[in-house]
Amino acid sequence: MSFLGGFFGPICEIDIVLNDGETRKMAEMKTEDGKVEKHYLFYDGESVSGKVNLAFKQPGKRLEHQGIRIEFVGQIELFNDKSNTHEFVNLVKELALPGELTQSRSYDFEFMQVEKPYESYIGANVRLRYFLKVTIVRRLTDLVKEYDLIVHQLATYPDVNNSIKMEVGIEDCLHIEFEYNKSKYHLKDVIVGKIYFLLVRIKIQHMELQLIKKEITGIGPSTTTETETIAKYEIMDGAPVKGESIPIRLFLAGYDPTPTMRDVNKKFSVRYFLNLVLVDEEDRRYFKQQEIILWRKAPEKLRKQRTNFHQRFESPESQASAEQPEM
């Protein structure tokens, strides 16, 4: 499959074709404006190779240049400071020395076993992207073609995946015990748990479980946190009684979350929390947040072929928001 470029002037069109484009899997990513883009999918350590085709549209014309190159770029862009993009990967291959083009040409390129340390990501305030960039250097205006790729980071975890179990409450009014079966979930996993009411002296009208995503960008005083409720699961509608136990089952596959991303290049983090919310008859809201880790599980076929995918996270701490009264 070809990546068709636009016209850079009336003379030349730049086109990039990957060597394994006919067999390589593609992945989708939602952009900041809500549109869905589809690009070829790569993993950490995979090589990227193909051809750069320069097609002349007007035979007989000449294109003078100061050199032709292709780059593999990994870049982080903060939307509130678009002038300050940070490249954490930049590999360059020179395709041609200074000269002139008088006819269509093709150039082979290969970036061997490219390190791709982070997952592609587009959020509310930040974008992490990988792309190929072809530049025809000219005296006045360079001709440039950028071509996006998508990178997924695959994680493996040991068999030990502790459950989360806590007792919370309001003194002499409400005392509940909640339990989630794991603390780390892959993106297609099911969150299974239960809520057990030990003491109920206030009238609970409604109870739900929320999956909350927090995107933290910047450092120090310039830190910005964007909070989004990814999923809501109604646990009960009505008053519980002492001794009642209510099951929880939340399917993550229906919500398309990203993996947890911790301190990516000291620029941003993406963290996920389970938020247990209770609403009483006076519409007061009580809650308890617990951080969980989301990770991308390697497909079975890929797990058998490759054993070098491993991504570790620090043990998360439970964190509660100050926006609402905590149980």
UniProtKB/Swiss-Prot annotation:
Cell compartments where the protein resides: Cytoplasm; Endosome membrane; Early endosome
Keyword annotations of the record: Cytoplasm, Endosome, Membrane, Phosphoprotein, Protein transport, Transport
GO aspect biological process, one term: endocytic recycling
Cysteines engaged in disulfide bonds, as pairs: none
Primary location class: cytoplasm
Keyword Cytoplasm: yes
Residues found modified as Phosphoserine: S315
Record note on quaternary structure: Component of the heterotrimeric retromer cargo-selective complex (CSC), also described as vacuolar protein sorting subcomplex (VPS), formed by VPS26 (VPS26A or VPS26B), VPS29 and VPS35. The CSC has a highly elongated structure with VPS26 and VPS29 binding independently at opposite distal ends of VPS35 as central platform. The CSC is believed to associate with variable sorting nexins to form functionally distinct retromer complex variants.
Family designation: Belongs to the VPS26 family.
Entry protein name: Vacuolar protein sorting-associated protein 26A
Native source species: Homo sapiens (Human)
